[in-house]
Every structure is written in C-alpha cells, then in structure tokens.
Swiss-Prot record:
Pathway: Purine metabolism; AMP biosynthesis via de novo pathway; AMP from IMP: step 1/2
Ligand binding (GTP): 12-18, 40-42, 301, 327-329, 412-414
Function: Plays an important role in the de novo pathway and in the salvage pathway of purine nucleotide biosynthesis. Catalyzes the first committed step in the biosynthesis of AMP from IMP.
Binding site for IMP: D13, E14, G15, K16, N38, A39, G40, H41, T130, R144, N220, T235, R299
Known EC number: 6.3.4.4
Positions of the catalytic residues: D13, H41
Manner of cofactor binding, per the entry note: Binds 1 Mg(2+) ion per subunit.
GO cellular component, one term: cytoplasm
Catalytic activity: IMP + L-aspartate + GTP = N(6)-(1,2-dicarboxyethyl)-AMP + GDP + phosphate + 2 H(+)
Keywords, in A-Z order: Cytoplasm, GTP-binding, Ligase, Magnesium, Metal-binding, Nucleotide-binding, Purine biosynthesis
Subcellular location: Cytoplasm
Protein name: Adenylosuccinate synthetase
Residues binding Mg(2+): D13, G40
Source species: Aspergillus fumigatus (strain ATCC MYA-4609 / CBS 101355 / FGSC A1100 / Af293)
Length: 424
C-alpha cells in the first residue's frame, strides 16, 4: 500500500480540497484522519460546486472508497445532510462509498451549546472557534467520557453515556437550552441509518492492504495543531503528520509522499497571533480579490503576506516531500509582493526557522520582509509553468529555495479543477 498524505501548512483554508480531488482520481482509498464538521473546503467539478466539511473529498471520484477515521468527531445530522447534498448534486452512489470508523467520536448538539458557553466565559481572550462543538467533544474524548460512533448501535450504552454527559454539563453550567431526551429520540432513527456505514477500521484496511494508492486528507492545518500550533488559538486535534499516522494506524514505512498545501499569501480565521497580517490596503485587497470567507463559518479571513518563518517551522514538523502553492492568481495585480523572512523578538533575537510557543511573544515580534516585484498580468487558468510571467516564476522559485529546496510541484492558478500547473 502506497500512502500519500495531504496536509495544510499554515492556518487552514489553503485549498487542500483541489489537490486531494486531483490525487483521488488515482486513489483506491481516501481517508479523513482528524477534525469534524468544523473543517471546510470547496471543489468545483464539471461546473458543479461541492462544499465538504466532514466527508472526504475523494467522494467526487467515482472509483474511490472513503473512510472517516478514528481520530475524527462526527456530528451525525451534519453527516447525513452533507451526504444528501452530494447525492442531490449527482453523486448518486456516494452513500455506498463512505464508511466511518467505529472508534470515531460523536459530536452532539450539546457540544455546540457548551462551545458557545465556554467562548463567552473567555470574553476578550476567546479562541474564536467555529462554534461547532469540536473542542468540547475532544475534551470529552480525552476525559474518557465521550461517546464513540460504535456505541450508538448499543441503545442502552448510548443512552446511559449521553445522559451522563448532559448531567455533567448541567452541573457545571446550570440549565442548558438542550433536551437530552429529544436527542435520544432522534438517535433512534440515526441508529438504523448508521448501521451500513460503521466499520472496524483495522478490518477495513485489511480489505485494501494491496491498494496501490491510499490518500489521506488532512483537516485544518499544522498551525492549528493542538501540540505544534499557536496554542491556545488552535483546534482540539492533532492536524499534522503524526496525527494522521496515529489516527489511521498507518505504517510509516508505507508513506510515499507528504504534500504540504500552502497559499501564495497567508490567511487566518478567528483569534490568535498572525505576525505577517496586513491591517491595511494590502490585507483588504488580498481579502477582497481572494474572496477570503470561511467555507464553514462564513467569517471574513484575516490576510497577510507569505511567511517563510512559519512555513520553515511547518516543514520541520511535517517533513513535506513536495508542496502545492495555491491561489497564485490572487497576486496578479500587486506592484510589489512581500515575503516575511524573519521575526525579531523584543530582546533583539532574530528567528528564521523556529517558532515561539508563547502567543504573547508572537504578538510582539517585528517582522522582516523582502520585497519582490509583482508581475501585473493575468495568470488565472495557466496550465504550464513556462507560460507564467517571469516574475511569477521568480516568486515561486524564491520560496522553493528558502524552504530548503522542497519542490513546489503543483501551483494553483484559479478555482476550477483544471486550474493547476503540475511541475514534474
């Protein structure tokens, strides 16, 4: 089994869906390793737009079987709603090609309510979550009181554990706008509907042990990783290479490539440090031209210049074998383009390839930039590297050199499925 892993290299929203969609055309399996319906990406295929949240985007490929792995959290109503949307858009057999590990955890509406209450308590220091209940669900998992997907099938166990969860949160927060008996009633229907989707993950993988190509689709990104991201302004799962290996029980020796997806500039949704953020006309232009609004929340994304310090750190953690640089065309109309090359700490220390763990330190760094000339010409839809303007190629090759020679193998030049340059 050859395994390709696609990972976000920044703070998410890099455009992982398109490269995953492209690679899934040759894949037998496509797997989600972590996260829940807080993730979001869009794929345009044959003029139809598909929005993915919890489902793997390999479902667009008719020959690809898909798995939601043990490291994920699944909001069951959203699972069925998203699946129905895909089927309505023409993917009629999607329900026959999607499976869920029995070890994945259930994200309840209760978790979403608690998410909002916890954010409100933080006040001005709120994390800026999606409000989907992901954090509280992973907290319950870590505290060993969560409900696994496989346990939904045992009615008595399921009801006992959900009532216990509700009692615990009621003791903490008081009366909640949540009817646990109503939720239990809804799951009587979901229980029957879930049966054909739930699998033992190891047994499932054994069926595909001779698969020539397995694709792992990362959710979120390295800088949102619970351990390695800008904690506490992170998600609640392990979003890097190690998390994918752990969640899917992958054999590390079978991993043939690790693809880092990185925007040609930088964006972030929600709170937290963002050293290269541009709170000026440049940031506004990136946001406007790039149509930077979250797929899941609709929130306006914060925008800034490409950050080499961040990406060197990301490379050191995830060990990318190749990169996919996305949304190059958004930079088409800039006279000059800046790249962050170093952080200077308040004490004068200059950092180029390490990333401070303390978010308050990150808020105080001064950023050093190099300025590169723009290309002032249209790159949207360009499919050959040699057809790019010289300054666009210079920008790509500068980033490539500064990241230690990790090849930028794919370059996104627009939203459509075929707006991609492949450099062999």
């Amino acid at each position: 089994m050859g395994i390709t892993i696609v990972l976000g290299s920044q703070w998410g929203d890099e455009g992982k869906g398109k490269i995953t969609d492209m690679l899934s055309q040759q894949a037998t399996l496509c797997c989600r390793a972590a996260g829940g319906h807080n993730a979001g990406h869009t794929i345009v295929h044959e003029n139809i737009t598909y929005d993915f949240h919890i489902l793997p985007s390999g479902l667009v490929s008719p020959s690809c079987v898909n798995l939601i792995g043990a490291g994920t959290v699944v909001h069951v109503p959203s699972f069925f709603k998203e699946l129905a949307s895909l089927e309505e858009k023409g993917l009629k057999d999607a329900g026959k090609r999607i499976f869920i590990s029995d070890r994945a955890h259930v994200c309840f509406d209760l978790h979403s309510i608690v998410d909002g209450l916890e954010e409100a308590k933080l006040g001005g220091r709120k994390v800026g979550t999606t409000g989907k209940g992901i954090g509280p669900c992973y907290s319950d998992k870590a505290a060993r009181r969560g409900v696994r997907i496989g346990e939904v099938l045992d009615e008595a166990v399921f009801e006992r554990k959900l009532r216990s969860l509700h009692a615990g949160y009621t003791a903490r927060f008081g009366e909640l706008q949540y009817d646990v008996e109503e939720e239990i009633g809804r799951f009587k229907d979901y229980r029957k509907r879930l049966v054909p989707y739930i699998v033992d993950q190891l047994a499932f993988f054994k069926q595909y042990k001779d698969s020539p190509n397995t694709l792992v689709e990362g959710a979120n990104a390295l800088m949102l990783d619970l351990d390695h991201g800008t904690y506490p302004y992170v998600t609640s799962s392990s979003t890097g290479l190690g998390g994918a290996v752990q969640a899917l029980s992958l054999n590390p020796t079978s991993i043939t490539s690790v693809i880092g997806v990185v925007k040609a500039y930088t964006t972030r949704v929600g709170s937290g440090p963002f050293p290269s953020e541009q709170l000026n006309e440049y940031g506004d232009k990136l946001q406007s031209v790039g149509r930077e609004f979250g797929v899941t929340t609709g929130r306006r994304r914060r925008c800034g210049w490409f950050d080499l310090v961040l990406c060197r750190y990301s490379q050191a953690i995830n060990h990318y074998t190749a990169l996919n640089l996305t949304k190059l065309d958004i930079l088409d109309d800039f006279d000059e383009i800046k790249v962050a090359v170093a952080y200077v700490l308040p004490d004068g220390t200059r950092l180029t390839d390490t990333y401070p763990a303390d978010p308050e330190v990150l808020e105080k760094v001064k950023v050093e930039y190099v300025t590169l000339p723009g290309w002032k010409s249209n790159t949207m839809g360009v499919k050959k590297y040699e057809d790019l303007p010289a300054n666009a190629r210079a920008y790509i090759e500068y980033i490539e050199r500064e990241l230690g020679g990790v090849p930028i193998k794919w370059i996104g030049t627009g939203p459509a499925r075929d707006h991609m340059i492949c450099r062999e």
